[in-house]
């Protein structure tokens, strides 16, 4: 009870601004108006793992004119897939479920938009029974050895 004197004064203060509020443009200009010292510095590469730096010369990469694009499935292969599938009386969805892929994958292969994947091509070859890779595209596949 020693502090309940008539002579003592209790001062209640507001909390200071949070980090997000202190960084705002308004807070900076207000501090400058009050005449406080304001230090602004841009964080550079904060929060990045700098153990692995880029070793390639970026100027050299800029000068390179090589076109970076992926090869697509030729339209010829798409037509062979379509004919083989229709010859077996299958829809795109049926073929997709047989090879455990999405129907969109089959559609992409047939219209020539897909990037060729040897695993998918092999699965399609086995189901429709036609070669899709190599020089004799569209020829019937040789029956493999029975195990």
From Swiss-Prot:
Domain annotation HTH cro/C1-type: ranges: 81-135
Q: Which residues bind DNA?
A: 92-111
- Localization per record: Nucleus
- Which domain of life, per UniProt? Eukaryota
Q: Does the keyword Cell membrane apply?
A: no
Comp. bias (Polar residues): 46-58
Where are the stretches annotated Disordered?
1-69
What disulfide bonds does the UniProt entry report for this chain? Answer: none
* Pfam families listed in its UniProt record: HTH_3, MBF1
Query: What GO cellular component term, any one, is given?
Result: nucleus
What's in the keyword line of the UniProt record? Activator, DNA-binding, Nucleus, Transcription, Transcription regulation
Which InterPro entries has this protein been placed in? Cro/C1-type_HTH, Lambda_DNA-bd_dom_sf, MBF1_N
GO terms for molecular function, please? Answer: DNA binding
Residue ranges annotated as compositionally biased, kind Basic and acidic residues, are 33-42, 59-69
* Protein purpose: Probable transcriptional coactivator.
Query: What PANTHER family does this protein's entry cite?
Result: ENDOTHELIAL DIFFERENTIATION-RELATED FACTOR 1, ENDOTHELIAL DIFFERENTIATION-RELATED FACTOR 1 MULTIPROTEIN BRIDGING FACTOR 1
Q: What is this protein called?
A: Endothelial differentiation-related factor 1 homolog
What organism is this sequence from? Xenopus laevis (African clawed frog)
User: Gene name?
Assistant: edf1
